[in-house]
Amino acid sequence: NINIECSSALDVDFNKSNLIISYYTIQFMHPSSRQYLFDKIYNSLEWGGGFIFFEKVRAPDARFQDIMTQVYNEFKVKQGYSAEEIMGKSKSLKGVMEPFSTQGNIDLAKRAGFSDIMSIFKNICFEGFLAIK
């Protein structure tokens, strides 16, 4: 059975599940709420169940973050976006989206109880993870 929810992830009453997917959602949650969500998801999964989550990620340091931002902005320009559109989007996300680093996301999963975690997708500053209970 598939259940699609449209509400705060913190308010969802997860049933026992074999698979839970989060697609670019957690990065918009307040950082102090994220561990609670990971814990809740882990506890809702059947043994051997998977949690797939995709997030925008920060680079491990400022130098690499500058490089990733530049590469991503160049990509957007090649896709036809104007400098004004790129800057407008960046400003609109300021204070609303707070991505963690790759390691920060892995650490959330580990603290929740996941021990088998791997990156399944990576493109510039976007990454997908699979965590298995």
Each PLM stretch: what is its role?
Residues 1-10:
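Conserved SAM-binding strand-loop segment of SAM-dependent methyltransferases
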Residues 10-20:
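A short acidic, Gly/Pro-enriched loop at the edge of an enzyme's catalytic core
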Residues 20-21, 109:
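Hydrophobic beta-strand segment of the Class I
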Residues 21-22, 52:
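A conserved beta-strand element that flanks and buttresses the S-adenosyl-L-methionine
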Residues 24-28, 55:
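Short catalytic micro-motifs in class I SAM-dependent methyltransferases
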Residues 35-48:
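A short glycine-rich, Lys/Arg-flanked "PGG" loop and its adjoining helix->strand segment in the class I
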Residues 56-112:
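C-terminal alpha-helical "lid/dimerization" subdomain adjacent to the S-adenosyl-L-methionine
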Residues 106-133:
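Core SAM-dependent methyltransferase catalytic element
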